[in-house]
Structures are given as C-alpha cells and as structure tokens.
Amino acid sequence: MAKTTQDVTDTELSVLKVLWAEKTATVRRIAESLYGETAKSQHATVQKLLDRLKTKGFVARDRTVWPHVFRPAIQQDELIDRRLQHTADKFCGGSMQPLLTHLLRGRNLTKSDRQSLRSLLDELDQEGST
C-alpha cells in the first residue's frame, strides 16, 4: 500500500498510467510507450522512476521472470480518491461538498453528464436510507 498521495510526481504518474493501461509491463515497454524508440538514457530514467514508485509502494516487481515485469500496486480510482481527499482536507477542512461544487460550477457539463451525476446522487441517497 502506498504511503501518501503526495509521493507521486507528474512523471511518476505518467509511468503509472502506462501500467494501468497495460496491467503489467517491462521497463522497455514503459519506455517505448512514453518515449517511442528508446535510448539507453530513457530506459535508465524509467528504471529509476519504477524504483522510486516501488519504494513508495505504488508498483510491484515480478523478479521471477527476465526481464522483470512491473504492475501497479494501487488502482487509478484509489489514487484519485486519495488525491481528492487530500485536496479536500487541505483546502476545505475535509469536506468534499465545496470541492465538488467548485469542480462542477462553470463547467460545460453535457446533458448526459448531468444525468449521470443525478443518478449517482439518487443512488447515494438510496444507500444512505437503507
């Protein structure tokens, strides 16, 4: 399990995005996904990022195969939840309501987006009443 959401830099997040999409990947595959045809320095950069992510608990390494295969140790939804809660804690005293209000106001939500949000609120209301 990851220590804290703030441990993930934007560059590390780009590596996690590849792993979320691929499920598992080698250093070479991640480097190719991020940089196209890779030079040794890019390969080394990806290895360093994976080492940092592993130390932080965000990725796992399978050493039983060669080359080693990496997989995400945190799901995208979990990281999103943690980051949003951290933002709510930092700016809104832990309340999600002001954060969500700010996110939704002034956005050009489609009719479908608004309907999905209404359905989610209805679902949450039903869960809360049972």
Task: List the model feature ranges, each with a label.
Residues 1-18, 78-79:
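Short alpha-helical segments that sit at the start of domains
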Residues 9, 64-83:
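Short, cationic-aromatic polyanion-contact patches
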Residues 18-26:
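Short capping segments at the starts of secondary-structure elements
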Residues 25-34:
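Short acidic, hydrophobic short linear motifs in intrinsically disordered regions
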Residues 47-51:
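Short, hydrophobic-biased segments on the C-terminal half of alpha helices
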Residues 57:
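Glycine-centered, phosphate/nucleic-acid-interacting loop/turn motifs that mediate DNA/RNA or nucleotide
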Residues 61:
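Short beta-strand "wing" residues that participate in macromolecule-binding interfaces
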Residues 79-127:
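Amphipathic alpha-helical dimerization/coiled-coil segments
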